Amino acid sequence: MSTMTPAEIVSELDKHIIGQNRAKKAVAVALRNRWRRQQVDEPLRQEITPKNILMIGPTGVGKTEIARRLAKLADAPFIKIEATKFTEVGYVGRDVDSIVRDLIEISVKQTRETEMRKMRTKAEDLAEDRILDILLPGARTVGFGSGTSEASGDESNTTRQTFRKRLREGALDDKEIELDIEMQAPAMDIMGPPGMEDMTEQIRSMFANLGGGKKTRRKVKVKEALKLLTDEEASKMLNDEEVKTKAVQNVEQNGIVFLDEIDKIASRSEAGGGEVSRQGVQRDLLPLVEGTTINTKYGMVKTDHILFIASGAFHLAKPSDLIPELQGRFPIRVELDSLSVKDFESILVATDASLVKQYQALLATEDVHLEFADDGIRRLAEIAFSVNEKTENIGARRLYTVIEKLLEEVSFSAGNHTGKSVLIDAAYVDRALNDVAQDEDLSRYVL
């Protein structure tokens, strides 16, 4: 669990997301409250439940990214789900309980990887021993008894240590060896009707277990063999029951569910009878968000302390169009701002993995040096903002389209620019994009 303070969390989020300070503060406090709750003694700790968050704002302003980065910081099981994927119980389609089942699968995978990392050093030693046994057959079985055999044993032990040193230095990486590796059962793609994902998953697991334990002899290079055997040894040391228990506990205490497009299941007051199943999905979500127990293949999972973050643009519906009971389950409401020209400029250059840095790195692989002038960045931001205003506002995602169109020619003919620098200034941007940006009909299709 993360022990970062709210200020530290916001500072980390600032490296990847521009603006939206109110939303960042809300999620930072929610994450910190999880740590605070763990410091509280029982039975009061059990009574403290997370305050779920409703983010309201247009598409492309950072709603999903805030939740995704938060989960990464917390190292917590995280799932992003579109609310529109679900149907009311009794209708054909997925029911909301599958959210928790998917989340527990993610948690099991995370927990398994964490536990395997802890055992990595010991597993690597065992893998090295197995490789040395193949490279030096009989070295371990030499001599107990006579003085000659003892001397021979010392000699073989010295040889073994020499080979181990060379193995660790990478001197044997390209040598080919034969070894027996546990076969992975081929993944079977079983098609099932909507809403029956659990049954198809169980059938898939059953077929996967049928092929388990079989070994196959393969000829591989030492470097690859070391990796394969390390993974195999680490898997052997894992206690599956312990992994399941930790995974369930991790979901119950630290799980984060991001419910996107929640406004699409809000029933507008003037709408007709077609809204029934939307209301049904909202009612099905109620116990999940409030706290219930879901039966999964890893055991019963309580949702009382899972943090739910819902988001929606609410263009056509309003938060008050959600059924009152569900509104009450999301006490913290945060409105995200639309992006300005200044925000677009910052997104292009100020974040840790900004678009400008990404394209510079991509073209640098072909020895093409992209240089962005300040006026070029400014003009790019202005065009992206302008196209958003004139057509559909898709937020920061517009920058992907604009910059891709801008660098289309350079990317295509990168081989002709090898060893050269390409300066992207305002004049270059205007030459590449002005015609498209000015023509509203054309920008609808191109940008």
Curated annotation (Swiss-Prot):
SUPFAM superfamilies membership: P-loop containing nucleoside triphosphate hydrolases
Family: Belongs to the ClpX chaperone family. HslU subfamily.
HAMAP family from the UniProt entry: HslU
One GO cellular component term: HslUV protease complex
Organism superkingdom: Bacteria
Protein's name according to its UniProt entry: ATP-dependent protease ATPase subunit HslU
GO annotation (BP), single: protein unfolding
Higher taxonomy: Bacteria, Pseudomonadati, Pseudomonadota, Betaproteobacteria, Burkholderiales
GO MF terms, alphabetically ordered: ATP binding; ATP hydrolysis activity; peptidase activity; proteasome-activating activity
InterPro entries: AAA+_ATPase, ATP-dep_Clp_protease_ClpX, ATPase_AAA_core, Clp_ATPase_C, HslU, P-loop_NTPase
Naturally occurring in which organism (per UniProt): Paraburkholderia phymatum (strain DSM 17167 / CIP 108236 / LMG 21445 / STM815) (Burkholderia phymatum)
Keyword terms, alphabetized: ATP-binding, Chaperone, Cytoplasm, Nucleotide-binding, Stress response
Keyword field contains Electron transport: no
Subunit structure: A double ring-shaped homohexamer of HslV is capped on each side by a ring-shaped HslU homohexamer. The assembly of the HslU/HslV complex is dependent on binding of ATP.
Matching Gene3D superfamilies: 1.10.8.60, DNA helicase RuvA subunit, C-terminal domain (1.10.8.10), P-loop containing nucleotide triphosphate hydrolases (3.40.50.300)
Chain positions recorded as ATP binding sites: 18, 60-65, 260, 325, 397
Gene: hslU
Annotated signal sequence range: none
Compartments it resides in: Cytoplasm
Key word Nucleotide-binding present: yes
Function of the protein: ATPase subunit of a proteasome-like degradation complex; this subunit has chaperone activity. The binding of ATP and its subsequent hydrolysis by HslU are essential for unfolding of protein substrates subsequently hydrolyzed by HslV. HslU recognizes the N-terminal part of its protein substrates and unfolds these before they are guided to HslV for hydrolysis.
